[in-house]
């Protein structure tokens, strides 16, 4: 699956040889991001939560992938939520960009797909934002946890959803179920 990994190995074997000098720029120049991603994707695939699946539309572009989260407990159980992740060139100094593609009624995800997850913030006052020591595995586990233990009604991005939960938990659950039936199957 990791065709980029085989390219990197091939390029490492060419270093120092005359062939490397004549190789095209595209085979000689591999970004720091891409080298990191080869290792991180392998680690991610080996440690993926059972409620998550990762899909790489183009195995040569590890910096663009889709994540499917299928919660097995809580309000969102039975739903199938799609996320799109793009890892910028400046990775790992900056976090990946993640968007929820599935319309959802959630206090930490807007209906347009914006996500409130501290580790996706480039700068954070409390120190819980992105750091170069974080990996894609942290991002995936964090997104997965937004449906369970990181579900946060006290610091919402979607204030309307949080207030709805505070006002009427049963009606909130009904709206979540309705969104799952309409958008998350």
From Swiss-Prot:
Q: As annotated in Swiss-Prot or TrEMBL, what is the tissue specificity of this protein?
A: Widely expressed (at protein level).
The active site consists of 116
Q: Which EC number(s) are documented for this chain?
A: 2.3.2.34
User: Pathway, according to UniProt?
Assistant: Protein modification; protein neddylation
SMART domains hit by this protein: UBCc
Under the heading InterPro entries, the entry gives: Ub_conjugating_enzyme, UBQ-conjugat_E2_core, UBQ-conjugating_AS, UBQ-conjugating_enzyme/RWD
Residues found modified as N-acetylmethionine? 1
Q: How is it modified after translation?
A: The acetylation of Met-1 increases affinity for DCUN1D3 by about 2 orders of magnitude and is crucial for NEDD8 transfer to cullins.
Q: Which GO terms describe its cellular component?
A: cytosol; nucleus
- Is Phosphoprotein set as a keyword in this record? no
* One Pfam family of this chain: UQ_con
Among the GO biological process terms of this entry, one is: post-translational protein modification
Q: Which family does it belong to?
A: Belongs to the ubiquitin-conjugating enzyme family. UBE2F subfamily.
Q: What is this protein called?
A: NEDD8-conjugating enzyme UBE2F
Quick one: which gene encodes this? UBE2F
